[in-house]
Amino acid sequence: MELNPLKKSPSSEAVRNLREASCGPVGTPTVTNDLSENIILTSLEDLHNWARLSSLWPLLYGTACCFIEFAALIGSRFDFDRFGLVPRSSPRQADLLIVAGTVTMKMAPALVRLYEQMPDPKYVIAMGACTITGGMFSADSTTAVRGVDKLIPVDLYLPGCPPRPEAIFDAVIKLRKKVANESISERSKITQTHRYLTIPHKMKRVEAKVNGQYLKAKTQLIALNPSLSEEFDQSLKEVQKISEELSSN
């Protein structure tokens, strides 16, 4: 086989023109109006967050008057079902813990146990002044916990005494925004810790008033103040003297 010296090899421009003519130019595909209305482009992470924020199942932990305001949401006037809130009685079926009211030292282990039994991811809303800082019940009380964030991590603080139902809705909306912006890859790296944002416990040592000696004393007042014993005896003698004079007359 002999090569024809007069036949030249095709140029690169001719090859490019032939390729474009046979294959067609590669461009951005056009999306029709019908196609754009039926297809949504998103990520698996956004889809997962969207499903969770629309189905928050709260576990209600009400210990005081703040819980009455949350109970008002169940009625038709506020209708909290539109946010996908389904109250649960078991912590294993809930992903939102709403703490409403004063938390005492005796109830603290039970609250921590309920939080630990909730599956991840889980969220906590501290509702009311008594839950956030201890409130008025912690002024001279040695049993009130001054802030629930000393026991469990809190995602959202809802101040008020008590907060109105509209404020509870605002807290739920803010929590939904937080859930929508979460990342699945970063959730395992970032762990919730105790932040201790509330005031510390400053207890005053008070001596015991009832020490068992009041059973041996004449009155409980003398048991608390032994220095009044002489005055009490003198007053008692005067009363007995007056009563004898009245009886003789």
UniProtKB/Swiss-Prot annotation:
Gene Ontology CC terms: plasma membrane-derived thylakoid membrane; respiratory chain complex I
Subcellular location per the Swiss-Prot or TrEMBL entry: Cellular thylakoid membrane
Superkingdom of the source species: Bacteria
Keywords of this entry: 4Fe-4S, Iron, Iron-sulfur, Membrane, Metal-binding, NAD, NADP, Plastoquinone, Quinone, Thylakoid, Translocase, Transport
Membrane spanning residue stretches: none
Pfam families referenced in this protein's UniProt entry, alphabetically: Oxidored_q6
Cofactor: [4Fe-4S] cluster
Broad class of where this protein is predominantly found: membrane
Gene Ontology terms describing biological process: aerobic respiration; electron transport coupled proton transport; photosynthesis, light reaction
Enzyme Commission number, as recorded: 7.1.1.-
Membrane topology: Peripheral membrane protein
Annotated InterPro entries: NADH_UbQ_OxRdtase-like_20kDa, NADH_UQ_OxRdtase_20Kd_su
Catalytic activity: a plastoquinone + NADH + (n+1) H(+)(in) = a plastoquinol + NAD(+) + n H(+)(out); a plastoquinone + NADPH + (n+1) H(+)(in) = a plastoquinol + NADP(+) + n H(+)(out)
Residues binding [4Fe-4S] cluster, per UniProt: C65, C66, C130, C161
Molecular functions (GO terms): 4 iron, 4 sulfur cluster binding; iron ion binding; NADH dehydrogenase (ubiquinone) activity; quinone binding
CC cofactor note: Binds 1 [4Fe-4S] cluster.
Cited function: NDH-1 shuttles electrons from an unknown electron donor, via FMN and iron-sulfur (Fe-S) centers, to quinones in the respiratory and/or the photosynthetic chain. The immediate electron acceptor for the enzyme in this species is believed to be plastoquinone. Couples the redox reaction to proton translocation, and thus conserves the redox energy in a proton gradient. Cyanobacterial NDH-1 also plays a role in inorganic carbon-concentration.
Subunit relationships: NDH-1 can be composed of about 15 different subunits; different subcomplexes with different compositions have been identified which probably have different functions.
Similarity remark: Belongs to the complex I 20 kDa subunit family.
Record HAMAP family: NDH1_NuoB
Protein name: NAD(P)H-quinone oxidoreductase subunit K
Organism of derivation: Prochlorococcus marinus (strain NATL1A)
